[in-house]
């Protein structure tokens, strides 16, 4: 009888671990697609507001350099 209880407990733990792994993967993919959508929106906004002029690009680079969250200047060069 105790073997059956141990087996059931191990099975429940395995199911719980697998369920959490699938949930975490879904959360990561949802966050990644949300982040990509936000990046795309920022890029579209930059292109729309700053249509390829030198002054606008320089202002974009200065804003990006002064922002602690800016990781690269890629969107400024478009």
Curated annotation (Swiss-Prot):
Family: Belongs to the scoloptoxin-04 family.
Signal peptide region: 1-24
Example GO molecular function: toxin activity
Propeptide: 25-28
Keywords: Cleavage on pair of basic residues, Disulfide bond, Secreted, Signal, Toxin
Organ and tissue specificity: Expressed by the venom gland.
Organism expressing this protein natively: Ethmostigmus rubripes
Name of the molecule in the record: U-scoloptoxin(04)-Er1c
Paired cysteines (S-S): none
Maturation and modification: Contains 2 disulfide bonds.
Assigned GO CC terms: extracellular region
Subcellular location per the Swiss-Prot or TrEMBL entry: Secreted
